A protein has these predicted regions:
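Acidic, metal-coordinating catalytic segment for phosphate/diphosphate chemistry
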Residues: 1-39, 115-116
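A structural signal for short, well-ordered beta-strand segments
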Residues: 32, 77, 81, 126-128
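A structural signal for the main folded, soluble domain(s) of proteins
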Residues: 33, 37-38, 43, 82, ...
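Residue-level signal for short segments within beta-strands and strand-turn junctions
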Residues: 34-36, 50, 130
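Conserved Nudix-box catalytic region and its N-terminal flanking loop in Nudix hydrolases
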Residues: 41-90
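Nudix hydrolase/Nudix homology domain
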Residues: 55-60, 119, 125-179
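Active-site segment of metal-dependent pyrophosphate-handling enzymes
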Residues: 86-134
Length: 179
């Protein structure tokens, strides 16, 4: 059962062509973890999306999506942030779009610990401050704002799939948490 919202303008490949491409090529993605920061730039809250997996389970995840042909990384980030968080989220993209890490997903378990059963994907992962009102859309059922300590709790970490809990820990370590 597929619970994903169909993209009315997929931008580059039909579903059949995408399936064939995923079997042959790594897909390029952006992933964004929305955060709220204090006046000194320290992360106060982490925004985690809740959505239903293809198996019907409730899982935590991040803003994520493919980079389309001839689309810049910055444009892909903005498009997916608006698609998942709404047009009033007001994301603050950094002057230089350098990711905190490059995440490699494989269709079966690998040394990276990240899995995506659909494909081999390479994701540029970002922490993105947002200052506006977020209204989760598309596949997301809700957006929960948690303190970094809450987001790192075992109960929240257990709600991630595909190794994304480790990616969240890495993101917060990059922002100075867990030292």
């Amino acid at each position: 059962m597929n619970v994903r919202t169909p993209d009315p303008n997929p931008g580059w490949l039909s579903e059949d062509d995408l399936y064939e491409a995923r079997r042959r090529l790594p897909m390029v993605y952006v992933e964004a973890i929305p955060v709220r920061c204090d006046s000194l730039g320290y992360v106060n809250e982490v925004g985690l999306l809740l959505q239903a997996s293809d198996q019907g389970e409730m899982v935590r995840t991040f803003v994520s999506g493919r980079v389309m042909y001839r689309e810049t990384i910055r444009a892909a980030l903005l498009r997916h942030l608006e698609k998942d968080l709404g047009p009033l989220a007001l994301p603050q993209l950094p002057p230089s779009p350098v990711p905190f890490t490059i995440a490699e997903y494989f269709p079966s378990p690998s040394e990276t610990g990240l899995t995506d059963d659909r494909q081999h994907a390479v994701a540029l992962a970002y922490l993105i401050p947002v200052t506006g009102e977020c209204d989760p859309r598309q596949d997301a059922l809700e957006l929960s704002w948690l303190t970094p300590s809450e987001a790192l709790s075992p109960s929240i970490q257990a709600e991630f799939s595909g190794g994304r809990a480790a990616l969240l820990r890495q993101a917060l370590a990059h922002a100075g948490w867990g030292r």
